[in-house]
Amino acid sequence: MLQFLNRCSRGRGAWLLMALTAFLLELTALYFQHIMLLQPCVMCIYERVALFGILGASLLGAIAPRSPLRYLAIAVWIYSAWKGVQLAWAHTMLQLNPSPFNTCDFFVNFPSWLPLDKWLPAVFAASGDCSERQWQFMSLEMPQWLVGIFAAYLVIAVLVLISQFVKPKRRDLFGR
């Protein structure tokens, strides 16, 4: 399995597939926001940024999958997936244990050199409450689904990282 993951990480197909999944999840978030009119909260926006980090990592890996740039893509992938798990878990705890003393921020806090909420308010502006339960599918809230999604991204990323230390088998037609 590790040799298979090593081979996949050296080709563009797996990186582009990951980019497609992250992009479709972003489109789903925008559908919930603009079509279903669910108001994203601050934690939702941060989770969206973590997903954009995974999308960026996959595009970085697809640019040059056989070069050392692949290692930077794996590092960004792991970091973004880990932050996504942390954010989604904290968001889940806010929803499962609502308290007036335990709330999320009222406004997103992006760095002054990267004010995403000012540049793209349709994507990064927060207007909802983190503890409000707005959507449910198969008895799980949206942050609970995101815990599973980010955890899957993280497990696969760690396996791909481990596979980088496994030498791929040479595929020789005559078995030499």
Curated annotation (Swiss-Prot):
The keyword Transcription does not apply. It is found in: Cell inner membrane. Residues 32-49, 90-144 are periplasmic. It is a multi-pass membrane protein. The chain crosses the membrane at residues 15-31, 50-65, 72-89, 145-163. One of its GO terms (molecular function) is protein-disulfide reductase activity. Disulfide bonds join 41-44, 104-130. GO terms for biological process: protein folding. InterPro entries: DiS_bond_form_DsbB/BdbC (IPR003752), Disulphide_bond_form_DsbB (IPR022920), DsbB (IPR050183), DsbB-like_sf (IPR023380). Residues 1-14, 66-71, 164-176 are cytoplasmic. Keywords: Cell inner membrane, Cell membrane, Chaperone, Disulfide bond, Electron transport, Membrane, Oxidoreductase, Redox-active center, Transmembrane, Transmembrane helix, Transport. GO terms for cellular component: plasma membrane. It holds the Pfam family DsbB. Required for disulfide bond formation in some periplasmic proteins. Acts by oxidizing the DsbA protein. Belongs to the DsbB family. This is Disulfide bond formation protein B. It comes from Yersinia pestis. The gene is dsbB.
